[in-house]
Amino acid sequence: MIRIAARNANRSTAIRSISTTSIRLNTTQKVVVTPPPVATEGELPPPQPKVTPPKATPPPPPKTKRFSLFGFLLKTTLLASVVYGGTLYAATKNDKVMDFVVDNRLPYHEELLELIETGSIDDLQQGLDQLKSKFGSVKLPSKEEIDELAQKLEHKGEDIIKETKKKFTATRTGTDLTPSEQLQKGVEIESVKKDVPHLPLIELNSELGSSVDETVKQTIASFNNFIQTIDASTLASKNDKLIASINFSISQLASKLNGLTKSFDEELQKKLKVSQTELFSSFTKKELELTENLLHQFTTEKQQLEAKLNEKLNQEIQASRTAISQAATNAVSMVRIEQTKNFEKLVTEKLNEERNGRLANLDKLNDRLTELEKFAEGFETQIVSNHKKALIQQAVSKLKSLLLAPAANEKPKSIKPYVDELSKIAADDEVLKLALKDLTPLLSNESTHSILTNAQLLSRWEQLAPELRSASLLPPNAGLLGHLASIVFSKLLLPVKGVKQDGKDIESVIGRVESSLARGELDVAVEEAANLKGWSRKLANDWVVEGRKRLEVEFLLGLIESESKII
């Protein structure tokens, strides 16, 4: 488009500009301000018209942002590309997403997945370098050539405008109105006459018209629009030659541009064919490599799956064998149990038949046998008890004879074997076990002559009596002289005849002990000796221990003998 901008005052051109794209005409009327008439003397000044200031126009409303279809399509395309690429990238990391992509057969998913998995920045750079090397020989018109062509067209347009401007005159019609009336009168717009002669338009040949670039066609259309605005009636006929030369130049320019375009297309087609052949061969090689890799992977996966399936099949076969074997064992066991039950039932029925027939009196015989068994068991228990009782009594009698009345001419013997034998015999009775438990410590280290008899205890007491008499005469805290005096004075004491029951002196105690030993009352004699006080009690301590030992042995043996009679 060619634009011409002009400011016209008195129908003359003030500013003119021509660009390579458009020409625009703008004309504005210059307002002529006339001075007010000078009033002469004696005359009234003319009334001045009241000028109202123009009202302030409100600011224009803000322009609303219009809907852009191109922006909407661009954003939608970018969003879809990001979602699609993210889905394919997630498919390489997740098997479920991969199954979704394969099942739905998304477009170009195989090529894009291969590019994501095997592609790299080096491969992308290599592909760009190959494209640059293939299309580098194709020569496009440079920016300088396009600018030069545009400048030529601009200069030719300026020349045409200058030639036409010389013939172009504008007439201005005056007016008889006063300045005040001119101010009050509105701006009049003159209508353009329709019947205006025009210059001949620029036209291309029919051969070039179909192959000329769209930009050239738009430039020619702009020139034609400009030519139509020029009034041909005021121009000389010699300008027709100028228009014809311009038409011829534009035709030559279009033909050259068409030739360049055709040569560029031919060269581009050749390069595309060569690149297509190379890409097809590389694609074939890549396809063969991928096929081999896929076959290798398929074979490997197949072998792994076969191994896993064989292992799983062997496990299932082994489990089935175990289950079948166990089921067979259970079935055989159940059959055996059932056969055993049937056999027992059959034997029971046969026994019942025999019992009801020839063995009708078998129950009575069985009852008699039961009674006989009970009698035999009771008799056997009684025999065992009597035998046990006899053995215990014999052992107790043997111990008594050895301990309480040993023979003077016999050698001393250990009592422990007799006590152990008695313990074995009386192992089932609790009373005997407790008695033997107390008797064993007493007799474990004793012999047949270590337990003193009543006569031996009496003779020892008689030997101890002088020492007791002398000890009773000792004063408290006596020294050597006190001991000698007690020995002398004890010789002077006369023995007491008879027994004094309530006497507390030493002679009464000695007499009661001797009397009790003579009667065989050892427990009374030991009690009297144990009640002594002071030094006399210490002197009689050994005799009291021996007496108590004999009393304990006699008591335990008597308890064992009594319990053996009760058994």
Swiss-Prot record:
Residues 36-63 are annotated as: Disordered. Keywords: Coiled coil, Membrane, Mitochondrion, Mitochondrion inner membrane, Transit peptide, Transmembrane, Transmembrane helix. It is found in: Mitochondrion inner membrane. Residues 284-383 form a coiled coil. GO terms for cellular component: MICOS complex. GO terms for biological process: cristae formation. Residues 36-62 have a biased composition (Pro residues). It is a single-pass membrane protein. Residues 26-68 are mitochondrial matrix. Residues 92-567 are mitochondrial intermembrane. Component of the mitochondrial contact site and cristae organizing system (MICOS) complex. Component of the MICOS complex, a large protein complex of the mitochondrial inner membrane that plays crucial roles in the maintenance of crista junctions, inner membrane architecture, and formation of contact sites to the outer membrane. Plays a role in keeping cristae membranes connected to the inner boundary membrane. Also promotes protein import via the mitochondrial intermembrane space assembly (MIA) pathway. This is MICOS complex subunit MIC60. The gene is MIC60.
